[in-house]
Amino acid sequence: MSKELFLEIGTEEIPAGFLPKAMADMEAIVTKELENARLAFGEVKTFATPRRLALVVKGLPTVQPDAEITALGPARNIAFGPDGTPSKAAEGFARGQGVDVASLTLVSTEKGEYVAAVRKESGRPVPDLLAEILPRLVGGIPFRKSMRWADLDVRFARPIHWIVALFDGVVVPFAFGNVQSGNVSRGHRFMANQPFPVRDFAHYLDECERHFVIPDPERRKETIRREIHRVAKTAGGHLLPDEGLLDEVAYLVEYPSVVHGTFSPDFLKVPREVLITSMRSHQRYFSIVDDAGKLMPGFITINNTLTEDPSVVVKGNERVLRARLSDARFFFEEDQKVKLETRVESLKNVVYQQKLGTSYEKMERFRALAEGLADLLNPAVKAKTSRAAFLCKADLVSGMVGEFPEVQGIMGREYALLQGEDAEVAAAIAEHYLPTQAGGDLPASDIGAFVSIADKLDTICGCFGVGLIPTGSADPYALRRSALGIINIILDRGCRLSLEGEIGKALELLSAKLTRPAAEVMADVLEFFRGRFVNLMADRYPADAVDAAIAAGFDDLVDAEARIGALAAFKGRPDFDSLAVAFKRVCNIVKDGVDQPVDAALFQEPAEGALFAAFQQVRADVEARTASGDYLAALTGIAALKGAVDDFFDKVMVMAEDERVRTNRLALLTGIARLFGGVADFAKIAA
């Protein structure tokens, strides 16, 4: 009969941001431990509140199954002498495995024959195994930051105060630090902070409800979602959606209650984004909007307790928010006393990065890049692009951005509009930070796109140029996000440009700052972009189509995606596999290529002439289709060669003894390979 394991780790308040990952890590660790222990099990569920991490595992046996364990020892020639006598190595191995040396067997492996010891291992009682597994589980949860407490050697996100560990309702005994496992949990810190016994998981859930704790974060989240929408409607408006904040507050409380408050309508004179940021980032408040989407003078906050007099909580929250918004209004009014273009000079006193100079120097570099992009792609907006690039970092030295960094760019836009700047320039000031996250909004204008690409490209090339290259675990300058942002902007707006050319311009502008050879930096940055582009395309298209098309070049990203899309569509043909095999044979035999004209006079087999004639017939059309970017039509034209290619390989020995004949045949195949090589490298196609 299957049994249940229940574990709860009771702690001091753990930061909300730690909990989702901790839940996933708990599930992964216990799954691996149980599998390693040869234990079958069913559903695994994890739970978290600020004060507890818990898990339940269903379907466990009471006894571990018996097993036959085979352990490899030394190689045969080491384990036995020429006469078959066991060596000291064999005797030591047998002794270590607890078997008689005479029972050793031989096992064949890829590396040769080895001795092996086969022993039977009787299954142990599962509670005994869990007493060893659970301490490793508790101590193995990786947190971004952990701490020691008292004079203990153990670490955890926050000090542990109790542990509940039950298997089939019976305590699994173990200690972690100075805490001994038991069957006693505790209720809500403020509303029911007393111990209560636990019989099993179902009983635990019932007792938690009685003690004002909702262990399941998804249930807390749905409770909060339902209530904040209800309260917003009662207030005469609608909730401003914010899934990120909802996720966060669900891990800040054990028993959520919703509170509605208001603030003076006078504060609505402050830009909407500032008010939302102040409420969201600093107070974890939800905003309310009217039917037109206009911000209303109210907020919703989530409390961790039920109160007899909610008005006390409301007044306290309103008082705190009033102080915050008063600061915001003060900065907003004071900042307007200084023109944005005047603030630009102050960027000379702001160090962007020690080796890369000031923010003013950075602005000058990416301004030149942005102007070049405008020259190339839309000369009509060059002047506005230059102006937007000049002003876009000025709000960094404003009081508002100093207090609320999240509104950088937004405040630049607002101040620019208030000071009479062109509306497109003002919009681009905010847009140049986009996208701020994966899948986020992209610049809506060419001006914003050019400044955004230029700023991000300067950042990437500058950091790579002074050795600040992202590692697997660290990317402090968000270079991956910047590269992906550039790629998405280019694809979104159809910017036909040379990626290598723009990187070269950026490196030239950075030449006085580079601490590495420019050629090395160029190679590294191109590879960095290639990796991001491949990952992005692999989410949209078959991986082999991506690899094959990119192998033919990715300097023009718009063109590269067009080739990938065409190849992915071409793969849908019923005869694609046989086509791919034929063209892969061509690619594989002419890896280096032969650069010389084909001489029909050297043909010795009819299949040679037939292939050459077919090639000549489609060549001009395929090249024209390729040049115009109609890659699917180009591939369809190339497919017409399939029969002649197959016939050629069936009837012609490419590597003829006569060097001139051999070279002529390779030249013919080289021409064909280069015909479709402008679209993709078929050698990369899985077929």
Swiss-Prot record:
It is found in: Cytoplasm. GO terms for biological process: arginyl-tRNA aminoacylation; glycyl-tRNA aminoacylation. GO terms for molecular function: arginine-tRNA ligase activity; ATP binding; glycine-tRNA ligase activity. InterPro entries: DALR_anticod-bd, Gly-tRNA-synth_bsu, Gly-tRNA-synth_heterodimer. Pfam families: DALR_1 (PF05746), tRNA_synt_2f (PF02092). Keywords: Aminoacyl-tRNA synthetase, ATP-binding, Cytoplasm, Ligase, Nucleotide-binding, Protein biosynthesis. It comes from Geobacter sulfurreducens (strain ATCC 51573 / DSM 12127 / PCA). PANTHER family: GLYCINE--TRNA LIGASE, CHLOROPLASTIC_MITOCHONDRIAL 2 (PTHR30075:SF2), GLYCYL-TRNA SYNTHETASE (PTHR30075). Belongs to the class-II aminoacyl-tRNA synthetase family. Coiled coil: none annotated. It catalyses: tRNA(Gly) + glycine + ATP = glycyl-tRNA(Gly) + AMP + diphosphate. The lineage of its organism: Bacteria, Pseudomonadati, Thermodesulfobacteriota, Desulfuromonadia, Geobacterales. Its EC number is 6.1.1.14. This is Glycine--tRNA ligase beta subunit. GO terms for cellular component: cytosol. Tetramer of two alpha and two beta subunits.
